[in-house]
Amino acid sequence: MTEAKKSLKRTLIGKVVSDKRAKTVTVLVERRVKHELYGKIVSLSSKYHAHDEKGEYHTGDVIEITESRPISKTKNWVVTRLVEKAAAV
């Protein structure tokens, strides 16, 4: 009865494509799926708005986001960790 609760929140890994808004980053998540009829591998992508409280993530960073309560009309995700820093130009 004292088992640890399993997290039911989804986590995704994606690339930051915009950091222009205050405390918000736009994350592009790409996934590859096999077409049901033809069998070809197809790349699908989705953009998510994630909450970045400190403003520490910038364009090009690869980050992990976790599902959360609605923060605003379009923001339901929170940045949890940095996976890979963007290369300096």
From Swiss-Prot:
Keywords attached to this Swiss-Prot or TrEMBL record, sorted alphabetically, are: Ribonucleoprotein, Ribosomal protein, RNA-binding, rRNA-binding
UniProt cross-references to Pfam families, sorted A to Z: Ribosomal_S17
What GO terms fall under cellular component here? Answer: cytosolic small ribosomal subunit
SUPFAM superfamilies for the chain:
Nucleic acid-binding proteins
Cited function: One of the primary rRNA binding proteins, it binds specifically to the 5'-end of 16S ribosomal RNA.
Q: What family is reported?
A: Belongs to the universal ribosomal protein uS17 family.
Q: Which organism is it from?
A: Polaromonas sp. (strain JS666 / ATCC BAA-500)
Gene3D superfamilies for this protein = Nucleic acid-binding proteins
Q: Which GO terms describe its biological process?
A: translation
Q: Which domain of life is it from?
A: Bacteria
HAMAP family in UniProt: Ribosomal_uS17_B
Complexes and interactors: Part of the 30S ribosomal subunit.
Q: Which PANTHER family match?
A: 40S RIBOSOMAL PROTEIN S11 FAMILY MEMBER, SMALL RIBOSOMAL SUBUNIT PROTEIN US17M
Q: What GO molecular function terms would the record report?
A: rRNA binding; structural constituent of ribosome
What is this protein's name? Small ribosomal subunit protein uS17
